[in-house]
Amino acid sequence: MRWRAGVAVCLKNWQTVIHLGTARVYDTGMNPKIVDAVNKQIRLEFESAFLYLAFSGNLRQYGLPGMGHWMREQYREECGHALRFVTHLENRRAQVVIPSVAAPVYTWETPLDLFRLSLEHERRITASIHDLLTLCREEREYATQCLLFDYVKEQVEEELQVEEIVDIMTLCGSRIDELLGLDQKLASRTTQAWE
């Protein structure tokens, strides 16, 4: 019994080392280019999450709690995306590097500006997912390709959702009653689990 408990402690310590990104415990044969690219995508997903969290606070301060809630749900979704990539690397016994994330830098004057920034950001994430998928095809990394197909579909939906909000806000113009109606509608958003 003691031996088994000792092994469990060792395995737990090995997992800790993997999570901290300080050593590689297993050589799984996963292409290092792919591992690096997935770790970069993890960083981008966490950067996205913190951008949306910042936008959420801005919108709540502006007096639009429904839009703030929508952005907070987007934050949760982006964290889920990052964690799914982490799980993929863990399942492949590849090294996971958890990044530090800098505070987002942006300027805005109106809530519409924040949603336009969101749309630009989602388009950058889409391009990054496409680049990662292209690399996986070139390197014949089929397991990661399968994972990425979900993200390709998700990005189409995310861009469309933000485009529709931008369109509605543009049509609202300076009509505060319309903006408040949209705010109320966005308050009902819930996040799908991605892990």
Task: Briefly describe each language-model feature range.
Residues 2-3, 8-195:
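Iron-associated oxidoreductase/ferritin-like identity signal
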